[in-house]
Regions:
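Conserved phosphate-binding/catalytic region of the ribokinase-like
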Residues: 1-3, 162-169, 195-293
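Conserved N-terminal subdomain of the carbohydrate kinase-like
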Residues: 3-6, 14-25, 40-120, 124-140, ...
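Structural motif
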Residues: 7-9, 115-117, 142, 179, ...
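Short glycine-enriched, charge-decorated loop/helix-capping segments at active-site entrances
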Residues: 21-26, 156-160, 232-233
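Short catalytic helix/loop segments, enriched in acidic residues and glycine
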Residues: 24-36
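Alpha-helix C-terminal capping segments
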Residues: 35-44, 251-254
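Short beta-strand scaffold segments in enzyme catalytic cores
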Residues: 36, 80-83, 217-220
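Conserved beta-alpha-beta core of the PfkB/ribokinase-like small-molecule kinase fold
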Residues: 119-196, 216
Length: 293
């Protein structure tokens, strides 16, 4: 049995991205963005996704990049619409027309990994029992909090429901690395100051907080803050920013301390932001960016 360095679990999403310049269709899903970013470290990466059988073609580009892929069948895939009405990359309106069937602890049967990253999109996709299974095996657990605080509203729009997250204490007590963005962090803590918000979240259990915002990322680890800017030559690929960032951070963190992992994640995310869809750059290009900056 292969032991992977990092297993990334999350639903495939069929994304419609709407900008003032036009509409594009993208194969999305946090697992997709995160896995391709993580593979740039050269580690052994496993991507586990749930989707409708008609969408299994998403596995092709991942396998071509050297990522092992497991596709689990669902009655439907998640269909998401992401609308960016202005030039502000953090101003967006999200809605869904269908939601994938949830994952289960048994989906990890036979999976051996040093670390597991859960990139759920909507509450209910990844149950607490799944996270407990990861921790029971002694693996490092990272999650993106969006998949626990976002719910589908009556009109199909995605909304934050931090107050209604009843399993918050149970989840955060299990997590080693927590990914959030500035909007989610404020919803969870009431703090607009990202450093205060990161410290507040760390006090609830996670050893490390990875917080993205429009200008870069902040990592709070070991009582210290580390930062890296996002400096794309042109902003063309906002969707998947956080997934790319956490995938690159967690994978690099398995090899290096927080400061180095933060710089690496900032570089990978910068290059991803220059193009729509998952990152299609090489590790050499990431290193070249770091040398220049």
């Amino acid at each position: 049995m292969t032991t992977f360095d990092l297993a990334i679990l999350g639903a495939y999403t069929k994304d419609t991205i709407v900008r003032p310049a036009g509409v594009t269709q993208v194969d999305g899903g946090g697992f997709n963005y995160a896995a391709l970013a993580a593979k740039l470290t050269g580690l052994e990466i496993l991507a586990i996704t749930r989707l409708h059988p008609d969408d299994r073609g998403i596995a092709g580009p991942l396998r071509e990049a050297g990522v092992e892929v497991v596709t689990l069948e669902s009655s439907c895939s998640t269909h998401m619409r992401l609308e960016y009405p202005s030039a502000d990359p953090d101003e967006r309106i999200l809605s869904v027309t269908s939601v994938v069937d949830p994952f289960a602890p048994s989906d990890l049967d036979g999976v051996e990994a040093r670390a597991v990253l859960v990139t759920a999109s909507i509450r209910g996709e990844a149950p607490v029992a799944l996270l407990e299974t990861v921790k029971a095996r002694g693996a490092l657990l990272a999650i993106d909090v969006q998949g626990f605080v976002r719910i589908v509203g009556p009109d199909g729009g995605l909304v934050y429901d931090a107050a209604g997250w009843d399993e918050r204490a149970a989840v955060l007590s299990l997590v080693d690395i927590l990914k959030t963005d500035a909007v989610e962090a404020e919803a969870l803590t009431g703090e607009r100051d990202i450093r205060k918000a990161a410290r507040a979240l760390a006090s609830e259990g996670p050893a490390e907080i990875v917080l993205t915002h429009r200008d870069g990322l902040l990592v709070h680890a070991g009582g210290r803050d580390y930062e890296a800017p996002f400096r794309p030559d042109e902003m063309r690929g906002r969707s998947g920013r956080g997934d790319t960032c956490i995938g690159s951070y967690v994978s690099k963190r398995l090899l290096a301390p927080p400061a180095e992992a933060t710089r690496w994640a900032g570089a990978v995310t910068t290059l991803k932001l220059e193009r729509e869809g998952p990152i299609r750059r090489s590790a050499a290009e990431v290193e070249a960016y770091l040398d220049r900056n």
